[in-house]
């Protein structure tokens, strides 16, 4: 359904979950509010955040909640092409503009006309391309490579980067005037370590997706200790890394319904296990037994989740265990860790 909000048409028949934006944590609730607010206007948006945090999903969500929802959404990775190819892709070219240009070709700005264009990794764009993009934003028109006439375009521009563009401006690598053009509105996507209470929800979502993709008749589940192991890791690759790990787990435990902690440790590549060990110095101690390690991991995960949720009951719900059982397990772990110290 399309409705009017403050004079701007927006799409209300839409859920962030439809795009895989999953989470009930405070950072994700704040992100959802930002997406809704940003969708109500047509200003340019700069989405920042670490790699793997879902910046393109946020861009798609803004588009899907906007009045342009039924119109094109065009995405391009600005860091994946050299200057010549990027310019041709964005602005199009005339026949004979360069060797191999046997016929004229519309660019992505024209393809996105009346809709939205998403410029991913805009921080990788060369200074020469930045100048041409700035002109498009100023004039609302593109000039194809090899052409003389300008073609008007009505496009909402959303850009994203994992770079600190402020530092890039200071280093002379990014134009300040372009920055102010693309960053009228800004959204920062939270890292996974900033919203660890969302990990169980994401894990269940990715398990369902992987089972469907692999046509597995079973629905995989992860036991409590396994979920704890996934929760305490800091996930430097964020949601993208978590999704890949879950897909690997489903593929390597295809015949089993329950994924145990041992299965997780056996399925993960040695490089990731080593990385996890170095990132968990508080709980990973030399000469620890597996039980000692799991006890420390449970306590760390419990404290992290309880701090984020503010409630023992909500923490138990996230870990898919009743509150009394969780309390008993936490207390037993505390006693064992105390005796081992």
Language-model-detected regions and their locations in the chain:
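Conserved helical "switch/dimer-interface" subregion of ABC/ABC-like ATPase nucleotide-binding domains
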Residues: 34, 65, 93, 132, ...
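Nucleotide-binding/hydrolysis machinery
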Residues: 1-7, 12-18, 24-29, 36, ...
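Linker/hinge segments immediately adjacent to helix-turn-helix/homeobox DNA-binding domains
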Residues: 7-11, 55, 267-287
